[in-house]
């Protein structure tokens, strides 16, 4: 099968598709055409006035070869619920879209669980030449799921095409660490991927694009990506540490004998590695400081931290695979924390750019810190944070690791020659 082909709803065979052209010319590099597009057209004016869509007509596959089955349908927005108000279509790109994490995530995105039940969505799926057939299979499953909010699905292997006009980029795809691979080598290999994707986002994505980096090592990959995308505010880049936060909440709830909805103000400081700092000093259980509820200081300082750090490895030992489903849930949580207002007094953890932070953490790295949002996609760092010597000492250890990683990838961030001196291996279990 050629790479410029699309699935035809008329039958199981593949039909040739003409090469497409991108609106934003990129003379410095050759372009591939989008490999396939699944699109549901919506009239924006009618959308604002009339409400929910009803399928009334389907174009012939020959006239719209980019269509994928039912997504060739045109919706008549005058036909149904007059009180329903659709928001503007949100374009979401997902890299590593044929992987296990994405397999859980994409259906949550399409269902409205993430952005809301009045938010139409377009999914733009980035893969590789090797994963292209799997991407077609993903698109077929999305088609069969009949999500009314899912208006477009496109698949491709060129980030300059897939990232066109995206509002959110969820960068999951990264090379796993192979047997005998040095951590410095993994930083370089994955760093190249995120440098290229940063350049593509810089060239063609929305200027207000929100970027969530999941592929590991995610903090430094996020730094590389933002350094290669100066057209997008550095504040818009995030490294996923929400799964670590969720794991910490679970352990505190178990120890206190409460359900986890009673646990708040949990922070993961630092790197997504075994130097991460689950913060129990500021955490609360049912509105009370954790140290007032859990009086076992030795457990908090030792077992709690180690349990959170090693949770992924234990899961692999039990199940034989890494935590794809819970990672997808944590991505949903991370996005929702930015698009819905933070509950009063609470905060959430996300890896963000440190320049200008109020805590004294080194600038110009991506570091997980406590944040609050008004629900507009923006955030502010929490100011009402307690700090003691025990917490600060561990924060500085994670900071030192990220500064060392930054030196390893200086050639990818425009800061000269790389120098790599990583004295210990702190990759989280399951990521080696």
Curated annotation (Swiss-Prot):
Site, as annotated: Activation of NADP-MDH:
67, 72
Active site per the UniProt annotation: 272
Q: Where does NAD(+) bind?
A: 197
Q: Which PROSITE patterns match?
A: MDH
Region labeled Disordered — which residues? 18-37
Which cysteine residues pair off into disulfide bonds? 67-72, 408-420
Primary residence: plastid
Q: Could you tell me where this protein is found in the cell?
A: Plastid, Chloroplast
| Entry keywords, A to Z | Chloroplast, Disulfide bond, NADP, Oxidoreductase, Plastid, Transit peptide
Concerning InterPro entries, the annotation shows: Lactate/malate_DH_C, Lactate/malate_DH_N, Lactate_DH/Glyco_Ohase_4_C, Malate_DH_AS, Malate_DH_NADP-dep_pln, Malate_DH_type2, NAD(P)-bd_dom_sf
- One GO molecular function term? L-malate dehydrogenase (NAD+) activity
User: Its GO biological process terms?
Assistant: malate metabolic process; NADH metabolic process; oxaloacetate metabolic process; tricarboxylic acid cycle
UniProt EC number:
1.1.1.82
Pfam families (alphabetical):
Ldh_1_C, Ldh_1_N
**Domain of life of the organism encoding this protein:** Eukaryota
Q: Which Gene3D superfamilies match?
A: Lactate dehydrogenase/glycoside hydrolase, family 4, C-terminal, NAD(P)-binding Rossmann-like Domain
Span of the transit peptide along the chain: 1-40
Q: GO CC annotations?
A: chloroplast
| Summary of activators and inhibitors of this protein | Chloroplast NADP-MDH is activated upon illumination. In order to be enzymatically active, disulfide bridges on the protein must be reduced by thioredoxin which receives electrons from ferredoxin and the electron transport system of photosynthesis.
Record family assignment: Belongs to the LDH/MDH superfamily. MDH type 2 family.
Assembly behavior: Homodimer.
Name this polypeptide is given: Malate dehydrogenase [NADP], chloroplastic
């Amino acid at each position: 099968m050629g790479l410029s082909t699309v699935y035809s709803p008329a039958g199981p065979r593949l039909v040739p598709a003409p090469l497409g052209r991108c609106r934003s010319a990129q003379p410095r590099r050759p372009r591939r055409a989008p490999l396939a597009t699944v699109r549901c057209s919506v009239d924006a004016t009618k959308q604002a006035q009339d409400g929910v869509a009803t399928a009334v007509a389907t174009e012939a596959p020959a006239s719209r070869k980019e269509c994928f089955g039912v997504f060739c349908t045109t919706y008549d927005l005058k036909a149904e619920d007059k009180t329903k108000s659709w928001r503007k279509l949100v374009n979401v790109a997902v890299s590593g879209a044929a992987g296990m994490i994405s397999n859980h995530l994409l259906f949550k995105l399409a269902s409205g669980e993430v952005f809301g039940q009045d938010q139409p969505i377009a999914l733009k799926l980035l893969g590789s030449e090797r994963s292209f057939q799997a991407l077609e299979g993903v698109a077929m499953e999305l088609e069969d799921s009949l999500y009314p909010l899912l208006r477009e699905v496109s698949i491709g292997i060129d980030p300059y095409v897939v990232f066109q006009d995206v509002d959110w980029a969820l960068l999951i795809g990264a090379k796993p660490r192979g047997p005998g691979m040095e951590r410095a080598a993994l930083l370089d290999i994955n760093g190249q991927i995120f440098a290229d994707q940063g350049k593509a986002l810089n060239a063609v994505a929305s200027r207000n694009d929100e970027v969530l980096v999941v592929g590991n090592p995610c903090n430094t990959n996020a730094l590389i990506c933002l350094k290669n995308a100066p057209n997008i505010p550095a504040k818009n880049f995030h490294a996923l540490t929400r799964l670590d936060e969720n794991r910490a909440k679970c352990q505190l709830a178990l120890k206190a004998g409460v359900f986890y909805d009673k646990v708040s103000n949990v922070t993961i400081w630092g790197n997504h590695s075994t130097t991460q700092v689950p913060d129990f000093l500021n955490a609360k259980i049912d509105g009370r400081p954790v140290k007032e509820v859990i009086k076992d200081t030795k457990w908090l300082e030792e077992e709690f931290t180690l349990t959170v750090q090693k949770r992924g490895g234990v899961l692999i030992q039990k199940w034989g695979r890494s935590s794809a489903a819970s990672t997808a849930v944590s991505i949903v949580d991370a996005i929702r924390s930015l698009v819905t207002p933070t509950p009063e007094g609470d905060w959430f953890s996300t890896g963000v750019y440190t320049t200008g932070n109020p805590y004294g953490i080194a600038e110009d790295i991506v570091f997980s810190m406590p944040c609050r949002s008004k629900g507009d996609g923006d955030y502010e760092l929490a100011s009402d944070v307690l700090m003691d010597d025990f917490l600060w000492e561990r924060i500085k250890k994670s900071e030192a690791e990220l500064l060392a990683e930054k030196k390893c990838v200086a050639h990818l961030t425009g800061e000269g020659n790389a120098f790599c001196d990583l004295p210990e291996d702190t990759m989280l279990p399951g990521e080696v």
